[in-house]
Amino acid sequence: MVKKRVHELAKELKIESKEIINRLNQMGINVKSHMSTLEDGVVERLHQLYRPDQEEVKPAAAKPPAAGQTIKPEEVAPQAQPESRKKDAAMLDSQKPDRDRVQKNGRERAGKATRADHYKGAGLVERVPSRPPDRRFQERPKQSDKARPWGQPRADQGARLKTADFVQERTRSARAGQDYSQPEKVQQERVQDRQQKERPPFEKAQQPRPQHEHKPQDSVKERPHPERASREADNAKRAERLDKGAGKTAEIAYKSGLKALEKAQVGTKPQRAGERGARPGGLHETKPKKNLAPGDAGYAKLWQEQTPVIPQKLLDDRRRQTEEKVKVTEKQKQQAKSQKLVKSREKRNAMAELAEERLRPRPAVAGSRKKGAAKPQEQAQKPAQPLEKKPIVLGESTTVQELALKMHKSPAELIKKLMQLGVMATINQEIDTDTATILAGEFGYEVEVKLPVDIEAMLMQEPEDDPVSLQDRPCVVTVMGHVDHGKTSLLDAIRETNVTATEAGGITQHIGAYQVEHNGKKITFLDTPGHEAFTAMRARGARVTDIAILVVAADDGVMPQTVEAINHAKEAKVPIIVAINKIDKPGANPDRVKQQLTEHGLVAEEWGGDTICVNVSALKKEGLKDLLEMILLVAEMSELKANPNRPARGTVIEAELDKGRGPVANVLVQNGTLNVGDTLIAGAAFGRVRAMMDDKGRRIKKAGPSTPVEVLGFSEVPQAGDIFVVVEDEKLARTIVARRQARKREEELKSTARVSLADLFKHIQEGQIKELGIIIKADVQGSVEALRQALERLSTDEVRVNIIHGGVGAITETDVMLASASNAIIIGFNVRPDVNARKAAENEKVDVRLYRVIYDAIEDVKAAMSGLLEPEYREVTLGRAEIRKIFRSSKIGNIAGCYVLEGKIERDASVRVIRDGIVVHEGKLESLKRFKDDVREVVQGYECGIALEKFNEIQEGDIIEAFTVEAIKRQLT
């Protein structure tokens, strides 16, 4: 026979697998899961346990009921009892010796044996003789709980308890004559303990199956169940929670049944609280007043007389009413649950409509409020009217959810439409303005794009001032010209200082800002470098100036940087005053200078033009007053005004990193007033003004328009030429600077082009170009910028300059390590390396070059780049020889006997063989001999023997030409 699994047996018995597993564990059979297999004997025992009706015997003649049996009203007289009932009394008597033997071993085990003998039946003795305790479960099937209302006690519980009391009483009477008889109090306590405490595992295996798995069978009597009281109590509590009305009805019926039974009972005491009660309309088994055994005469008659009979129709009616009420309660619960779901859904819809109503722009209210009576009708008609599709206002970018709210559509519709358009998007994904416009057009909406207000753009846009608040301001004058034409010397003469003597090489390499006073009016001078490397500085000076002074040496005339300065001034649209300097020199010719200026569009006033020309001598201080008068005249004609009562705005002229003071910026205030404590922004740097110094080094607390000052307090060194603006607070400054830095990073990432397959060969070719890596450190930002531009102009197609890093301040150890890693040199301009940097440079063998004059640095870099250039190769012919005789040797090969026609033939030279004007071979000499001696060279007019490497096909009359290749170094132009 095939072994059955637990779940197959459960399906066959129509019960749960878990219940079978629990029952098998109680019987002492270990089962792990529902897939475990069972032996045939175990399956048969479970069949007998859960289907005892299959082993029923045929009914015999009616007999008196045995102890422990329950007699239903409809089965008392008319039906015949099974033959197994006949043996109950005999079995009780036959088991008395066993009980006595067990009682000698222990009182508690005696009580258990008594109860086990009482519950034994004759139904399964023949089938399972090996486990007698299980036989009491096979006696007869139990009645299903479906036949009674939920929560009501069973009708046979009281009878079962009374039968147990009868058995105990019978046992005590049988033991009355023994020495080890137990008091009645101890026996009662033991009965209560057996009813309340949990059974040991052996007795747990004998517990009956659940009552709800089998249909009720009227032909079989119910057997007692010791643990049903607790389960029935739980069912009663559950029934009370489900329906109070049904519970009250059941309680009334239960109490009425108890009263009827108490009146009908003879010789029994009333039911106490805590004991198992009877089912409404059920039976109470009564304990006979007389001590009659089941086999005694008159026992059955007394039993039937004391058992009241309740009509079955009354029980069925009460059961039907209770079941209907339970069904009504379940139906009400389902209705309440569905109503709750509907209310929650309506609430969510109302909240969504309220949110859309708040986002929707409200139309203007027209007319009076007297038309309020017609509002409900208008609202009822609103859904029928088509919605007016107003233009959707969008910003720079929007999410799908925001666009759906504005269009009164669900996000799913928009996502579906985007998928149709080939765009995969989520509900929170941002889409650009173009995509949003196309998507809105698909639904018939127009789009208006309104970009958000850019705070940075508003700050950079200079507002218009009220003409009443404008005041006169000093003019800003920029001195421009060629190098060594005397710009700084002229300013020294005006300021009565000696700045030129303190500058390296006698040339200006920074923008200097000064302020002088003449005739009670202030003039601000900006001194720009004249060297060609400082083009950016000159252009920056021309942008911030009001008047440009073009200094031209009378002996040199117009030079390249002079022309560049003229172009900067014209581009900035500022008036130009020409100062012809060095008129005291012997070779001075001012007229020639004026003639040259006319070639560039500057015509002197005395020649009918509008350009003011002043002859000055900075060395002898001649013509300075005339120059200042002309400056004030042009400024007065220009009507220079500014508003000092507003936040300051200006330009960063120069910036540097001071070791003791940190980032320092020379700024020119162009409008407003700059105060100590103001928060300002300059490019990617921001800060609070901690201190200000004027051009003479004095601390000041405020600086008005056209005032050059030195500002301390920046977070980092700003770029020269940046516009600085005073803002309200530091928080706003940080926000704007963060945006600028993020924008700068994005631009750098965009500028980094990706290498494609088509450009791969191009990049390979570029890899063959030699590079000279340079790290620039200078004292001011302007010098770094000038050096960078000057060195980058030296790059050619074969060698180029790679500026790895440029910064302001002293040379540090970090710069040295960067140069070592990138194989670069360090150029320091007006700065020195610290101690650690010098030691690191020696250890890493990094070349550090220090300069104070910019053109010295440019010349050295040019020489270094020239050394990287590939040299040019040139061929030099040494001599020619004619082959007149051929000598053949087995070891060497053919030897040419030659006569040197011109020049000389050297042994290490390269040769080529020419036959009839055609080169037939080019190679090296293997040997050169004169007679039998090896020689280094043979000059013109002598004979020699020549052997060629790897070439023997020589002929008489061939010409051997000797030559060498020379390498010629190249220079950068």
Swiss-Prot record:
NCBIfam families assigned: IF-2, small_GTP
Superkingdom of origin: Bacteria
Record-stated family: Belongs to the TRAFAC class translation factor GTPase superfamily. Classic translation factor GTPase family. IF-2 subfamily.
Segments for region (G3): 527-530
A GO MF term: GTP binding
Segments of this protein annotated with the region G4: 581-584
Species this protein is from: Pelotomaculum thermopropionicum (strain DSM 13744 / JCM 10971 / SI)
Domain tr-type G intervals: 472-641
Record region (Disordered): 52-388
SUPFAM superfamilies tied to this protein: Initiation factor IF2/eIF5b, domain 3 (SSF52156), P-loop containing nucleoside triphosphate hydrolases (SSF52540), Translation proteins (SSF50447)
Biased composition (Basic and acidic residues): 83-120, 128-148, 157-172, 186-202, 210-246, 272-288, 314-333, 343-360
UniProt protein name: Translation initiation factor IF-2
Chain spans, region G1: 481-488
Chain positions recorded as GTP binding sites: 481-488, 527-531, 581-584
Annotated Pfam families: EF-G_D2, GTP_EFTU, IF-2, IF2_N
Coiled-coil stretches: none
G2 as annotated region, ranges: 506-510
Gene that produces this protein: infB
Protein localization: Cytoplasm
